[in-house]
């Protein structure tokens, strides 16, 4: 394994947003990825648009920004440009963790050799991955800092899931989960919470063992909720559902950036204990009661978000993302994306109406 850690300016931030491509007539997923990529050729900087496993998914990558404030200003305009490209290709753009009714297994796999190989190796779990996430990259100075940042972010994965929960429906049914995406993603190997690494060297050894065993080709086949990304010189948070509102994307990016910068303030937590809170957040979203294992107390997810923001505000001021971090408070005091989708269904009585709402709200 390449053991050098990429050099990016510390604590710069970028995101990858995975969008659903929707048939305007049926409101079902449509495998239009190749058409959208062709439409975007020359229209956007190289590398901005990418395919994922499902041909009904469009990944949009931002550049690295010096501050989350810059990211927040850029996101709406970027989304607008991508939406126009999708419309020229005969698709609508939706940002949410899962489609309300399209069968996952009916979505074609993209033609990339990497994803064809994944499909061949995994079978059914790969065919279930019609899910859409938000990935946040934060640059850190080196490998040891990356391991500490991964640890700090991992213990807060349940809170990220609660705040971002935006996938209540699966194949036409209400799952009674706030984030069905979190459970579907768990079907694939090397997903979920990362192992607890004591050092960069331990992470490298872990990956090298998996490579020698023939399980993976490189570290990018470790699809944990948060992982080091040596090539980019970042830590990558992968747990959140895709966000309909770009303001929420920016708020979650600010929380991620602050935790990465303040990683030394947070003790590592046993992943088996964090897993319990992850389940509670997956099931109940911001209505979850999370257990603080170090403080031996139960705390409501909304309260946990407020306490964490308060703790991180001095860091946010240094990073210039105070306003965006306070956006986490706005999320914690309002309905989740999952709640809003359910409210549309209750009001309109149709999952197609939920898709229409999501398409209109994906600003």
From Swiss-Prot:
Enzyme class: ligase
UniProt catalytic activity: L-cysteine + L-glutamate + ATP = gamma-L-glutamyl-L-cysteine + ADP + phosphate + H(+)
Gene Ontology BP annotations: modified amino acid biosynthetic process
Lineage: Bacteria, Bacillati, Actinomycetota, Rubrobacteria, Rubrobacterales
Protein name: Putative glutamate--cysteine ligase 2-3
N-terminal signal peptide: none
Presence of keyword Ligase: yes
Family per similarity comment: Belongs to the glutamate--cysteine ligase type 2 family. YbdK subfamily.
InterPro entries: GCL_type2/YbdK_subfam (IPR050141), GCS2 (IPR006336), Gln_synth/guanido_kin_cat_dom (IPR014746), YbdK (IPR011793)
Organism, scientific name: Rubrobacter xylanophilus (strain DSM 9941 / JCM 11954 / NBRC 16129 / PRD-1)
Annotated Pfam families: GCS2
Documented EC number(s): 6.3.2.2
Keywords: ATP-binding, Ligase, Nucleotide-binding
Domain of life: Bacteria
Listed GO MF terms: ATP binding; glutamate-cysteine ligase activity
Annotated NCBIfam families: gshA_cyan_rel, PRK13517.1-3
Role, per record: ATP-dependent carboxylate-amine ligase which exhibits weak glutamate--cysteine ligase activity.
């Amino acid at each position: 394994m390449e053991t050098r850690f990429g050099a990016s300016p510390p604590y710069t931030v970028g995101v990858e947003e995975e969008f659903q491509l929707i048939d305007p007539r049926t409101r079902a997923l449509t495998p239009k990825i190749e058409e959208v990529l062709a439409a975007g050729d020359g229209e956007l900087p190289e590398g901005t648009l990418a395919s994922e496993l499902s041909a009904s998914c469009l990944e949009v990558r931002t550049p690295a920004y010096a501050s989350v404030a810059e990211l927040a200003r850029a996101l709406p305009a970027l989304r607008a440009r991508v939406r126009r490209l999708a419309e020229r290709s005969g698709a609508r753009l939706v940002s949410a963790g899962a489609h309300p009714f399209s069968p996952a297994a009916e979505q074609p796999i993209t033609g990339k050799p990497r994803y064809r190989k994944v499909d061949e190796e995994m079978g059914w779990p790969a065919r279930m991955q019609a899910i859409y996430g938000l990935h946040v990259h934060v640059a850190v100075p080196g490998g040891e800092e990356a391991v500490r940042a991964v640890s700090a972010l991992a213990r807060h994965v349940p809170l990220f899931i609660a705040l971002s929960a935006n996938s209540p429906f699966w194949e036409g049914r209400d799952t009674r989960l706030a984030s069905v995406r979190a459970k579907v993603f768990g079907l694939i190997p090397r997903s979920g919470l990362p192992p607890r690494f004591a050092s960069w060297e331990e992470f490298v050894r872990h990956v090298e063992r998996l490579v020698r065993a023939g399980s993976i080709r490189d570290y990018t086949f470790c699809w944990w909720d948060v992982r080091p990304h040596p090539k980019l010189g970042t830590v990558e948070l992968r747990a959140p559902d895709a966000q309909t509102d770009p303001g929420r994307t920016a708020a979650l990016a600010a929380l991620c950036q602050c935790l990465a910068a303040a990683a030394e303030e947070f003790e590592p937590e046993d992943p088996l204990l964090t897993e319990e809170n992850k389940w509670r957040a997956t099931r109940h979203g911001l209505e979850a009661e999370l257990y603080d294992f170090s403080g031996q107390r139960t705390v409501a997810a909304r309260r946990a978000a407020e306490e964490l923001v308060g703790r991180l505000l001095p860091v946010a001021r240094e990073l210039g993302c105070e306003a965006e971090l306070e956006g986490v408070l706005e999320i914690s005091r309002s309905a989740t994306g999952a709640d809003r989708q359910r409210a549309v269904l209750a009001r309109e009585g149709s999952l197609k109406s939920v898709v229409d709402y999501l398409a209109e709200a994906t600003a």
